[in-house]
Amino acid sequence: MEPQKKTVDEELKDLFHAFKDKEAMDKPWDFRMWDIEQKYMFFEKNQLIAAPLYSTSSEQLMAVVPNNNLDIKKRPIFLGLTDKLLTLTCQLSVNDEPQLVILEANIMDLYRSTKEFKNYSFYADNKGTKMTCCFKSAAFPDWFLCTSIQPNMPLGLCKAGDSKIILFNFENVSSTPKLLQ
């Protein structure tokens, strides 16, 4: 019998509990993320693309750690790319609209810092079902991580109510997390 999948809330509680002590963990946890239309994350040409799993590229797992410098009740997290020194951040575009940017940054350095790093932070908010959540920008609170309805398009930011998809499945796929000795 296959073990029952954890809810997003359970996954996040485990994450925040494990990373309570900033010196306890030596690497982020890996999560599989896919939108409610079954599009998974792929890193291609320096962009994070949402596409069906049968895509020709390898699925990009997301490195995740909590941001303990913001209000923990809102479940702030940093999202990076597993096995890469790249992290998602929200910045203003030349049109003064928030945009999603992937920057070179060590997610564990952000985690260990005492700075808030709101531009790098997303609030993981249960929406939809117990198995889905949305990721709200901490720097731009009305903006959410999103995918296009069309496959093979880059992830971005949008406001709630837009025609884009803001609900994601979020599943920890890390092997036993390592504690520093």
Show which residues each predicted segment covers.
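Lectin-like carbohydrate-binding module/patch detector with strong preference for beta-trefoil
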Residues: M1-Q181
